[in-house]
């Protein structure tokens, strides 16, 4: 290619690297071992933030949701009205390539089967925000999606109320 053509291409502007679904989302199936375990799924939760949604597959135990906005050891249960719970042996760390779990029966009980879905914060894909409610209908909640949300989940973390 001629130097002139190279200059034209360079002058056209840089293009961001594409973001693929496996950069921002992971389904991970595992068997519990009841000790601290790193779940390596390639999702950068430490640097980018996100949510880990875990379900024990061989029982009726609730789905556990932990996210970087509320911090490690904090859980919400999608099938319960409970306020935010604390599980000091649940999700222990958000890592640059996944996350670390302890020996909690919600995440890592010996020989129990689990599935986790990890969502990384990314424009036009997923975001987590926290806010204080003020009982105002039609209130706008700021987010970093850069687009209109396709789905919104809301849950009080301080009171026992069902998910709307």
Show which residues each predicted segment covers.
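Surface-exposed molecular-recognition determinants
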Residues: 2-164
């Amino acid at each position: 290619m001629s130097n002139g053509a190279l200059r034209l291409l360079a002058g056209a502007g840089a293009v961001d690297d594409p973001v693929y679904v496996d950069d921002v989302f992971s389904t991970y199936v595992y068997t519990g071992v009841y000790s601290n375990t790193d779940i390596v799924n390639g999702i950068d939760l430490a640097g980018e933030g996100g949510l880990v949604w875990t379900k024990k597959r061989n029982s009726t135990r609730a789905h556990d949701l932990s996210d970087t906005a509320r911090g490690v050891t904090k859980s919400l249960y999608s099938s319960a009205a409970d306020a935010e719970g604390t599980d000091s042996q649940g999700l222990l760390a958000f890592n640059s390539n996944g996350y670390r779990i302890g020996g909690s029966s919600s995440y890592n009980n010996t020989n129990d089967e689990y599935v986790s879905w990890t969502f990384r914060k990314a424009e036009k894909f997923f975001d987590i925000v926290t806010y204080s409610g003020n009982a105002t209908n039609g209130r706008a909640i700021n987010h970093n999606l850069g687009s209109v949300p396709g789905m919104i989940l809301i849950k009080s973390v301080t009171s026992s109320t069902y998910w709307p």
